[in-house]
């Protein structure tokens, strides 16, 4: 192969790489505080909108200040869809065993995920989430606690969402994930093409002494039952 041909190929690769980086940078909408994290944000939005045909308006977040974003949990694709519909970074509470997955651990740490130990008292995670809300951040969680497919009976909501809403005074913004082909799967759901939809609902506010009613209403909203 001639030097000229090798040079032309190298120039073409560099050109394609630069074009891709510009495309990712133009697609990102949330500022994660770093060039590469913002590029990943752009990649995720393209993936969810093109491959998973995501239908969703931007989540109705306040321009500044805290909020809790909560959703039903049907697959490992759910958090990617929520990020793709958010104009602000989301800090997810995730299970400790998921947080410690090889390779992904560095990414989870970089985007501020908060690990929750499910085998013991989750107080440390709740306090970390409360501090994030006090700093004006957006915290996202799945109050059912684990993945639940539509054919299973509803799971009772974890009371941590009520604690965070009460302690921070932040609005709770419910979402319902629908149209996922890979229900019940984690990594596999990301690569099974879906017609994903995020349904938005009005914010909820927890009033003093109203925890049970709040959780019941949130359960109905997330499950549609």
Give the ranges of each region predicted by the language model.
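Hydrophobic/basic alpha-helical segments enriched in Actinobacteria
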Residues: 51, 60-62, 121, 184-186, ...
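Transmembrane-cytosolic junction motif
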Residues: 15-38
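Non-catalytic C-terminal accessory region of glycerolipid acyltransferases
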Residues: 7-8, 16-17, 124-225
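Terminal signal-anchor or tail-anchor transmembrane helices
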Residues: 1-22
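Structural motif corresponding to alpha-helix initiation and N-cap regions
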Residues: 56, 101, 123-126
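Helix-to-loop junction immediately C-terminal to a conserved catalytic motif
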Residues: 30-73
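Short, basic, glycine/proline-bearing loop/turn elements
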Residues: 43-44, 110-116, 146-147
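Catalytic core of membrane glycerolipid acyltransferases/transacylases, capturing the structured
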Residues: 26-27, 63-120
């Amino acid at each position: 192969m001639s030097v000229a041909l090798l040079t032309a190929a190298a120039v073409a690769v560099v050109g394609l790489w630069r074009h891709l980086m510009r495309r990712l940078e133009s697609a990102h909408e949330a500022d994660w505080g770093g060039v590469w994290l913002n590029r990943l944000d752009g990649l995720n939005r393209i993936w969810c909108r093109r491959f998973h045909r995501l239908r969703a308006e931007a989540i109705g977040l306040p321009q500044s200040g805290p909020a809790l974003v909560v959703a039903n949990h049907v697959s490992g694709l759910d958090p990617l869809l929520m990020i793709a519909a958010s104009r602000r970074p989301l800090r997810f509470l995730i299970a400790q065993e998921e947080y410690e997955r090889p390779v992904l651990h560095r990414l989870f740490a970089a985007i501020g995920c908060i690990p929750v130990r499910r085998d013991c008292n989750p107080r440390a995670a709740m306090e970390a989430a409360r501090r994030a809300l006090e700093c004006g951040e957006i915290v996202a969680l799945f109050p059912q606690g684990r993945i639940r497919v539509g054919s299973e009976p509803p799971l009772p909501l974890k009371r941590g969402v009520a604690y965070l809403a009460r302690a921070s005074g932040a609005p709770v913004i419910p979402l319902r994930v629908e149209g996922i082909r890979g229900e019940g799967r984690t990594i596999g759901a990301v690569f099974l093409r879906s017609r994903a939809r995020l349904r938005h609902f009005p914010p909820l506010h927890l009033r003093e002494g109203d925890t049970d009613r709040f959780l019941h209403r949130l359960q109905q909203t997330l499950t549609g039952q």
